[in-house]
Amino acid sequence: MTDLEIETVSRVSSNPDEVKGSSVVEEEPDSESTIKSRVSDEIDEHDSIPEQSNTEKSIEINDKNLEAEKDIESNLSLRPPEDDLDSRSIESEQTGTLSKQTTSTSEAPQDLKIWKNISNASNQNSGKLNPQLFVIEAFKHMSKAKATKRHKKLREAINNVQIELQKQPFLLPEVILEPLVMACQTNSTTLLTITLDCFAKLIDYNYFDSPTLNPSDITLMERVVNTIASCFCGESTPERVQLQIVKALLAAITSERTIIRHSFLLTAVRQTYNIFLLCKDSTTQAIAQVALLQMVDSVFQRLSTVLNHEREFSTINMNKSSSNGTPDRANSPIPSQLSENKLTLESFEHRKSFDQVREEAPLEEDSLEQQLLRDAFLLIRALCKLSIKNIPYEHEYDLKSQSMRSKLMSLHLIYHILRTYMNILSDINVKIRSPTSTPTPLIDAVKQYICLALAKNVVSHVLPVFEISCEIFWLILSELKNFFKSELEVFFTEIFFPILEMRTSSNQQKIVLLNIFHRMCEEPQTLIELYLNYDCISGNTENIYERAIVTLSRIASQSTSDPPPSFVFRDDQLVIDKPGFVYHTLNDIPQLNSSTIGSYVHSHNPPYFDYQIRLKSYRCLISTLSSLFTWCNQTFAPTVEITAKDDETESTSKGEEPQKSKSEPPSAGINSTSMDNLESSGQALATDDPSQFENLKHRKKQLQEAIQKFNYKPKEGIKILLSSHFIASKTPTDIAKFLISTEGLDKAVLGEYLGEGNDENIAIMHSFVDHMSFNDIPFVNALRSFLQKFRLPGEAQKIDRFMLKFAEKYIDDNLGVFKNADTAYILAYSIIMLNTDLHSPQVKNRMTCQDFIKNNRGVDDGANLSDSFLTEVYEEIQKNEIVLKDEQDPTSNFPEIPGTSNLSFAANISNALATVGRDLQREAYYMASNKMANKTEALFKDLIREQRERGKLSGNDIYYTARHFEHVCPMFEAVWMPILAAFSEPLQLSSDPALIQLSLDGFRLAMNVIFFFSMDLPRNAFMQTLTKFTHLNNTSELKWTNMHALKTLLEISLAHGDKLRDSWKDVLLCISQLERVQLISAGVDINSLPDVSTTKPLRKSLDKNIRQSRSGSISLKHSKSFQSASTHSTKSSSVEIVREYSSREVVMAVDMLFSNTRNLGSEGIYDFVKALIEVSWEEIECSLELSNPRLFSLQKLVEISYYNMRRIRMEWSSIWSLLGTYFTQVSCHENSIIASFALDSLRQFSMQFLEIEELSHFKFQKDFLQPFSHAMENSQDLKIKDLVLRCIDQMIKARYQNIRSGWRTIFHILAYASKIENLLVLQCAISVVSSLGHEHISCVLTQGAYIDLISCITKFAKLNGNQKFCLSCVDMLKNLEHELIKHLKHMKKESVYSKKLEEEYWLPFLLSFNEIICEASDLEVRSKALKVLFDCLYRHADDFDEEFWETVSNKALLSIFSILSITNSQRLYLAKNTEETEVWMLTTMVEALKAFIELIKNLFERLHFLLPKALNLLEKCICQENSMISKVGLSCFSQFVLKNKNQFKDVDWDEIINSINQLLQMTLPIELRDPSLYPQVNSDSSLEDVKENSFRPHEISRFNSQSVFKSKKHHLKSIVVKCTLQLLMLNCLWELFHSDNMLTNIPKRKMVKLLDILKQSWEFAESFNSDFEIRAKILSSGIVEHMPNLLSQEALCAKLYFYTAFECMSSLKSDSHDTEEYNDLMDVFQKKIYLASQLVLHGFQRVIGDNPVKGVAAFQPVIAALVSYINSLDEIQFSRGKSEFYQLLCAIVACGHIDQQLGTSLSNAFLRYAC
């Protein structure tokens, strides 16, 4: 039928023959009685659900309209469907007179006015027109009919009307209606045809549009509808009459001036529906089908028009109200009132009629909108109940049957309503109101019926039913998911997932369902919200999103037979590209008449159906990834701008007010004890905060893991649940509450845990049972319910404990049922045994009912239970085994398939033979689908009851709307592993191009999401998998799949380089293998190209800055698929594939990959370089044994260095930290080819890099040239060292002007080269240094490399064996002085000069000479350096301030003499060559000492502050064991004092005298008095005894060993050295004091201190000489040959003392003799002289007794000098000590031993006294 024919149904010609002639097929009908019974059930509500509520009482109301009212109001309380079982049928026989109707459903006058206004606005030409012409004609034909003549009343009524029509043009509708009604009560086909046609035309002209005066009466139109409907009498009704009935009813329902509602509307729809089903003519069926569609559209279009009108009207009123400042709240119900008036079952029980409710209800309850809403509700409910009619198994595939056509028609109408009028259903403000309950949205009122309709039909194996049911589900999922949150979970988990996973479901079902999943995957919003509302919500909710992806991945991974490459699908064979399998479009309802519907009977299986299903699954996965990435790139409004109103519309499923305002904090945190607290707060997650949802997901995962642990080890699982706060506390109550309310627990494990015999488990079990309720439940049902909570363990003691507690609980809940708990216990135990006996396959002789009764005799406290009760129990157990639902046989409890009932053994054999031609898969699915449907229906009932009990809105009912892209990250992390497995399978096993392309597309899309969120673990897994499938390690097995994988890998790498991170290693390793394949294809021997991925040499570790551990990668198992697949390709094709790897496209892609590194970010280029370094090192390591090692990646490193050289310094420094380290390592490689290549590449790169200007104080060049330095220091190959120097030389010559910080590295390299003992390398280094010294010194100075230059030249100046070059280096330094002066002058001009800066230049310069002086091997070089140094100091003495001179003296001068600070033994240990050290000390050091002292001596006025340092240095020299050094030191000391005696100040003299004191103390042999060095000697022994025994061996034996003796011998030698130094020092002082005017320059007070110093040495010598015991010990020790003495020191000290004292006294002559100072000094000197005279006299007397000859010879000059000094005193001085001197002279004479000189002196003295 064409669209034009459908649109003109309401205008069918009045001649029924015209329509009759268009009939297409006329079938043989069933018997009339059968059809009537079937039709009467089509809309009968009593058969909707086969159960009836036990709690609701039936309400007897005769009025059919009130029954419809009750149907609506009963649904407002959201009762489950079983509570509506007693409602009256919307289909009833219209018997009796219409006047007896007590209640009217006509519209109120005000509503009629509104509707007329609306109708007039839409149709200005509508209204009452004069129908005289066709009425007269109709009545004329009626009067001529034969039937009219047989009915007197009818004939009279017709005649009356004809007469009245002749009198007046217009008659009242009641007048015309009466004969028409009478005509319809006849059985005349002619009369019925004419009458119905007349009705239709009158309705078109709105003739019956007359409101009744009494609102309780029915309208004329309603009477007309009843009359028209009564004309249909089943299939026996003539087809012409049926067509006219359809036309008339359609005109009535679609009338724009009147509204047919409630039972009258349903009556019209019912009769049209019956005609559609029962009519034999296919054309009439088609017309009836279109009429039904237009009736439905009329109802909802009228409702839509009224809703739009009222919204506009309310908007105007709101604007007026807001302008007046007073909002209109009259129509807003008070919440407290609404809660009080909530409709309940009890209110129905006490309600007498709806009249009182109507009278008390507000006026708005009777509004037109509410009336139309009730019509819509009743219509949808009726269609839903029609769709769930059960169809016998054998008739399910007969699509032409009336029951199947009825089901399909109802489903299509439901789909049409949902699709077309979704705006009405999805509007939460469209609410059905009731005076006794809160307003209920229309969608909530019809939701339960739609769900039940889907549950019954979506499991159907009849494909048209299944597909239209899936389409309805899709509309709900896409548009109404916020209203069906809990219901959608049931559909997914109980129906759709099982269908996809079942083997018995057909491929057609799977492809239809995959189409729905594909649409779901294409909508990002739907996917995200599925994840938020199911996967992230804790509790028992299924992970819908995750399971959907896992299921799709599993289907995609299934093995199928792929079509051969030559196979091409026709359009009708490729079903995956079509929107539906049966219905290619659902924009219009398909023709369901009996002639056309047969085309759906034979479902076809297109070729390679499994393959197409697999393709569809891949498309679903790809759509999922595409949707996720699309969602990532969307822009969302800021969450903070969401208002409370937004939350109301976007965060809740039922339009309720949010439970908390935004200012209030959530009631519970994520980590609280129970997650229900968080979800029960409607506002807690209203804004879908990603972090909170991530925590929720984590929390749910924790719960699932804990449950899994419980199912494995229950006690450990309980511990985890407690620690994670899923169980509030350790109390048995809390644990039992969790166990009984949590799904997913293994019931067998739970039974074992609860049955444990310890006290804790028993307490938990008791609490577990106490949480159950058995109130008013039969005993067997209670026991069955009890045993559904867990699996009863097999141990008898455990069973006993369970039964005891059950009996106790049952008796508590049902007092009086049994006499005591023992009865319940015994009976329960008996039933358990009976259940086992009747249903265990091991039991052969089963218990009979009499046996069971006998076993239970006297169990009720001695009394018997009734036999009927026990028989009922037995039969119940026999029919229905007590078994866990999860373990129940899926074939049980379902309608038996015909021919499969329990038969005998022989009959079963016959049936087995009979199944040969049966569809066993279909039968298995039929049983499984029935189970799914029943279970789903039960879940919906429980769900609705639960919602009613806990309130309309709870935490789990809140529907969260996605607003954040951050949700995508955890979504992908939850499913990436099955997705990866699915996409890997075709690449691994398939050769089908479509599958491979889909897989690679999946990889691309997955990587988009991965890179967007920078997920490490998935990235590594996907990239490693993709690189693995390039299969480049085996060129003989390459396939086109591998080529495509490589191209995809390159595309991903080019597009997402910044995000690859560690995966760059896999990509670059693959490119390295690609280069190997290209070389092989070019003819290179494969043996000379080792594969990096397969060769595993002994790896050398990279530097830790380069190498990082890579964790989290997933290694995929190697499969033999490549080997098996390779057998299908010929050798020629393999060669062709290998050549393709060298194609221009691949080569350009690889080149672009490296050239595009300049576009990578800072982190991206860092990761790229790091990975390329690792690959390069692996290439090198795997090809060490080859003559030409692989250097591909090393070359690429140089390339990318060129590309990225111009990056900002921060990025380049990061890159070079890797490159520099790697080039440093490679340049020292043991393979010279590799090292040379690295250095040469680095040289070329350096030439480019040095072109870039470097600013001051940066060190990029220094770091860049560091690999050269490392190669010079660490390479063992002299050729590499020579290459380094040549590279440096070339860089200097070409880029010296641009070198800044690089000079430091260059000079460091050259300095190190000076240590190499190779002539060629040394000559090259010398050449470079010479060139620098003569050509580029000024450039180096300006570039800040001055110190490094000096250090370099200094090291070359110290070379051994090349005197000429070393002298030239000293000259370079000398010339550098002039350049330095110029540079400093330039700095002064540039205003960057400072004194400190100048000194920073001078000090390194001076220190370089110090280094040469101390370390140069050639004496002439050292001497020249020494001369240049001191010449420079003389020239610039005035330029240096005192502080800098201090620095110079300490670091550049005094450090030369640092060797003097160590002992001889240390010197011998430290010096490499003792002889050279001695020579250096006697030559260079002595020369340096003289130069230093000479410097201070000549510049003393400028350098007087260095006097203490100079004296300290001289002290060290004088105290050396080397006599030459000591003498030089004494000479320098003497000359220094003499030279500057006139410039010394008092403080200087203090330093000098202190120095003299220090020298005398240091050279004083105090060790002579250490008794531990010598053996004990008897004090009574004479000198002769000592001499006699001094060399006896046995006297020496007291020493412990010869080594001890040698040690003491050496110690004595040091004592002798001290004695010698003491004499030298005294002689030096003697000569110094005898110099001209020496003593006169020393202050007299200082001389007193000097005398005390001299006397200390004198007294020590005198004391030693007087100690015979010590001297004897020394002699007896054998370490000396003669008796030791210190006569020379004693005599010289005495002589020097007297000379000094008398000279000081003599110098006082010129002073004033009267001054006090003079007298004090004279007294001091005289006293000292007198005491000293006594000391010398005592010594003279001692030597006369000990050794007269030698002693007298030593003391006589001293005595003579003393007497001579006395004689030299002037008279005043002589007279002051005259008496003391006289006594001294007398004592001398008394001693005797007076020689001529002494005698002469004494004579002169006495003569002076005589005078």
Swiss-Prot record:
Keywords linked to the UniProt accession: Cytoplasm, Cytoplasmic vesicle, Golgi apparatus, Magnesium, Membrane, Metal-binding, Phosphoprotein, Protein transport, Transport
Pfam families according to UniProt: BIG2_C (PF20252), DCB (PF16213), Sec7 (PF01369), Sec7-like_HDS (PF09324), Sec7-like_HUS (PF12783)
Region Disordered: start-end pairs: 1-108, 316-336, 643-688
The keyword Coiled coil is assigned to this record: no
Gene3D superfamilies: 1.10.220.20, Arf Nucleotide-binding Site Opener,domain 2
Motif HUS box, residue numbers: 533-537
SMART domains for the chain: Sec7
Residues reported to bind Mg(2+): D812
Subcellular localization(s) per the UniProt record: Cytoplasm; Golgi apparatus; Golgi apparatus, trans-Golgi network; Cytoplasmic vesicle, COPI-coated vesicle membrane
TM region positions: none
Gene Ontology CC terms, in alphabetical order: COPI-coated vesicle membrane; ER to Golgi transport vesicle membrane; Golgi apparatus
Compositionally biased intervals (Basic and acidic residues): 33-49, 57-73, 80-91, 643-663
PROSITE patterns: SEC7
GO biological process: endoplasmic reticulum to Golgi vesicle-mediated transport; intracellular protein transport; regulation of ARF protein signal transduction
Residues where Phosphothreonine is found: T326, T742
Compositionally biased residues, Polar residues: 92-108, 316-326, 669-688
Residue ranges of every copy of the SEC7 domain listed in the record: 692-880
Modification Phosphoserine occurs at: S40, S332, S353, S741
Segments for region (HDS1 domain): 889-1103
Summary of the knockout phenotype: Causes high production of ROS, significantly decreases proteasomal activity and sensitizes cells to tunicamycin-induced ER stress, resulting in increased apoptosis.
Domain notes: The homology upstream of Sec7 (HUS) box is necessary for the allosteric activation of Ssec71.
Known role: Guanine exchange factor that acts as an activator of arf1 at the trans-Golgi net-work and is thus involved in vesicular budding and traffic between compartments of the Golgi apparatus. Activation of Arf (ADP-ribosylation factor) GTPases is essential for vesicle formation via recruitment of cargo adapters and coat proteins necessary for Golgi trafficking. Involved in tunicamycin-induced ER stress response and subsequent apoptosis.
Protein name, per record: ADP-ribosylation factor guanine nucleotide-exchange factor sec71
